Each structure stands twice: as structure tokens, then as C-alpha cells.
């Protein structure tokens, strides 16, 4: 073996598996060494001459010539442990070869510029090489397109006798599962059998992992889906033989909280520092929606070290059997280095009876203080509550407001315990009669029900409404002379029969079933009726000073508020008519009865 026939940089210590390349340069390698292709100028190539045969082993002759094929296996980079490219060449035009089994004869018609013509360059991952017949030294090449060809070794006279054994060893090195660093090395024959070219691998994306150990500088084509993990990977053949250091960074400031069922519990996930506190703030804000089914979305942005801004948006629904049909919540949160503040505003659907605002302060130690301010019949409005929440009032101030509201409600509830019992008894008695009367009457008769006991004892004549007179006749009402004379003395003031059922209905909160448009119309009618009732009270209380009438009205309003609050606590539903005039009207009529 002459030193000139070896590649300049190749030695036997380059790799045990590459010892087969420590042979004399073949025709293909000598031709490429001339520099026709720079990538193969110093590439070690193991090549031999073959003749093309059929599957049955018959020689294929085209125009009475044997088809000669020179196949070479090359390694394009010295750092690759295995070869990665297969080269196919044929005799150039002007150089014809006729080969037999174990013998070769040449006849040159003219002097050719080159002996071989390179026709194919295929990565070994797209080719499966196998032994077709060991005795006849036949190989089988199966390409990724599905086509196959069969080659029979045709060595020269001066070649080694164990040349085919080297090919078998090379095939064995390319067949095992890939555990090398090169992605362009040959894929195992069994795995490559049914894989078409450029067809996506049907394996699950979760099962696909990067193949290789140590300094991985190339990846398999089967891992090309995983863009985030193979970014920056390249072939060492075109990088000057230098490996690349891969450092796949993962985002650290990403917060993604998904809560299928809104609750106060947060999934146990590894989180540190800012991310953990932002997630805890989102979970605490989600508690405003209760335990109803819904979804809560939390988005966090890290504006500065130790500071996080959180935006919260969520929806909630209750089944057909529930009292509410939907619910919505929206809020913002800001986290300082030592504490977390959350402001949440929610709205409930179906009756639109309550709008609440929640403010929370969360410290690093884990203690949490929560204050809730809501809209009540006699408390602040929803707009004021939202303004306080947006302004960021201190927690102590909001807590004091909430506690005062709760104490006032408890006092009114205790004072109206007896009135609640009366209201319950009257509602049970009048439920059947109230349903039938509501269907037949419209307009002003909607505020009145049949079975009025007060109308049978005392009712006034009205010249303003004929419908009220007809209702009085149907219900067998008797007009009072005193009240009639009083009605004639006041010009422009109409008197209608006062029904006990109507007072009971207003007192028990029956008006919650009407719409907001109907309530606005009723307020206009009731305002005129209030003036009439006040006039009646003034006429009856002869010799009573004006200051007493004012006291009576104040007591009436206080009593009406107590009844409304007690019914809200029992039924769990708020009243729709929350105007301050409605309780005045209802309880004024009640005072006249008692």
C-alpha cells in the first residue's frame, strides 16, 4: 500500500469503524481527488465496481452491453463517525467496459478526458442497502421512492479477495438504530423500508425525540417538526468540521393559568418568585365567581424586576335549576415587591340585581384580607362602588364600610321578624288568588288583586277613572261619605280603592317579577297616588299637627325597609324595584290600614 494512495489527513486512528477506508484509492476516489467537487476532494470513499442484474440474478444487457455501475460510500466530514453519502457513477462516454464474473477487459476507442461520470449523489438516510445473495456477492439497493435495484460485485484483478466482506461490514454498521451524532448517516434498513421520501412520519409528536448523545451537531429528518428544539442545528460538513454548542432556552416569564372550574384552589405547579405570586393572585381573584362552572383566564406581564401586572377575565354559568343564568367577572391586578393588590368587578345575569366589587391585598407571608362592598336597596350605588375600587381605597376603609352595612342590616332584620311572619302568612293565602287575577287585568289593574278586604269596608269614589269604579262594583265595595266629600274638596286629585292585597304584594316583594320598564311607569302612577293618600291621612287626623304626619311617614319608611331586607335574606333573591319611593308608597298604605 503506497502512501500516495492514501488521503493526506486520514489515519487508522480516526475510527475503528472506518478502518475499511484505509485502502488504496479506487477509480472514483482518484477522479474526485482531482478537485471536480470540492466537498469530495479529501473525503474518504469506499467504492467498488458492480454490474446491474435483475432480482433473479440475470445480467441486464442494454444493446448487448453490460451495465456497469461504480458505487462509493463517502464521509463528507472528518468528525462524522459514519459515512453519510452514497455516490453512483457510470463509465464516461468514450470509455466502454465489458465485465465478466471475476474478469475485466477494456477496449478504448479514443482517449477520454475522464473515466467515470458521476450520476447520483444520495444521502444514506434515503437508501437501504442489504445483502441480496451472499454466495453470488449480490447487493440490493432500495430507494425511498420505493424502487429497487440489484448489483453484483465485479472486482478488479488486483483487489482483495475479502472485498465483499467489507461491504457486509459496512451494511451492518448502517443497519442498527441510529445512536450516532450524524443525522445524514444511513437509517436502519428495517426502518427505511416503508418510509417514502418527504412524507411526514406518522409517529406521534410526543414520541419523537432527538437522537444522539454528547455534542449533537445534526438532527434526523424525523425530528424536523420540533422547530424549537432543532433551531440552530446544521450539518458539520458545511460548517468547517466544527461542532455547534446548542443551548435551547425556554421562556421564563410566561404565565398561563387555565381553570376549568372556578374555585379558590390553584393547581400545584413548580413556580418561583414573581410567577408564583401572580398565579396565586389570579386564583384568589377567581374566587369572586364562587363555585359555579365557568372559565377564568389570567394574563401576566412582567414590566420590571419584581413587578407584575395581571389582567383577569372570566365567565360563569349556572344550570337550569339555578337562580341565575350567567355571570361575568373582569379585573386587574398589580404586584409590588412586597404585596399584591387585586381589584375585581362582577355582574350577575338573569335579574341584574347585584353588582359587587372585590378588593384584595395579598402579602408574601401568606396572609390575605378581603373586603366586599355591594349594592343594596338603601346603600351606595354601583357606580360609587366601582369608583372606590378603581381608586384603590385602603383595605381598612372598605372593611369598615362593609362592617357598618352588615350591622345595619342585622338590626333591621331583627326589628322586622314579626313583620316577616305576617308577610309569609299573607303570601301563602293570596298566592292562588294572585295568579288568576294577574292574567285578566292590565294597566293600573295590574297593581290590584281580587279579594281585597279593605275595599269591602272603605273605598272612595273616583271621577277620574271609570275603570276603578267598575272594579269597585264588581268587588261589592261600599263608598265612604267622608272620603267622598274629601275627594270633592280637592280638585285634580283622583282617589282609587286601596286593596289590602296590593299592599301585601308590594310589601312581600311581588314587584320583582315585573320588568324595569313597567316599574318606571308604575312609579309615575304611584307618585300621584301618594299625594292622594297623604291628603286622606291629613283629613282623618283632624287636629293633628303637621309634624306628626312627618313622624308617621318616617316610621313607615323604616318599617318598609325592614320588611324588604328580611324577605331578601329568606328568599335569597333581591327585589327589582329598588327606588326609595316604592317602599314609601307601599308602607303608607299599610299604615292607613292598621
UniProtKB/Swiss-Prot annotation:
<protein>
    <recommendedName>
        <fullName>Golgi-associated RAB2 interactor protein 4</fullName>
    </recommendedName>
</protein>
<comment type="function">
    <text>RAB2B effector protein required for the compacted Golgi morphology, probably through interaction with small GTPase RAB2B.</text>
</comment>
<dbReference type="Pfam" id="PF12480">
    <property type="entry name" value="GARIL_Rab2_bd"/>
</dbReference>
<feature type="compositionally biased region" description="Basic and acidic residues">
    <location>
        <begin position="408"/>
        <end position="433"/>
    </location>
</feature>
<dbReference type="GO" id="GO:0005794">
    <property type="term" value="C:Golgi apparatus"/>
</dbReference>
<comment type="similarity">
    <text>Belongs to the GARIN family.</text>
</comment>
<feature type="compositionally biased region" description="Low complexity">
    <location>
        <begin position="510"/>
        <end position="521"/>
    </location>
</feature>
<feature type="region of interest" description="Disordered">
    <location>
        <begin position="390"/>
        <end position="525"/>
    </location>
</feature>
<dbReference type="GO" id="GO:0005634">
    <property type="term" value="C:nucleus"/>
</dbReference>
<keyword id="KW-0333">Golgi apparatus</keyword>
<comment type="subunit">
    <text>Interacts (via N-terminus) with RAB2B (in GTP-bound form).</text>
</comment>
<dbReference type="InterPro" id="IPR022168">
    <property type="entry name" value="GARIL-like_Rab2B-bd"/>
</dbReference>
<feature type="compositionally biased region" description="Basic and acidic residues">
    <location>
        <begin position="468"/>
        <end position="477"/>
    </location>
</feature>
<dbReference type="GO" id="GO:0007030">
    <property type="term" value="P:Golgi organization"/>
</dbReference>
<feature type="compositionally biased region" description="Polar residues">
    <location>
        <begin position="396"/>
        <end position="406"/>
    </location>
</feature>
<feature type="compositionally biased region" description="Basic and acidic residues">
    <location>
        <begin position="442"/>
        <end position="455"/>
    </location>
</feature>
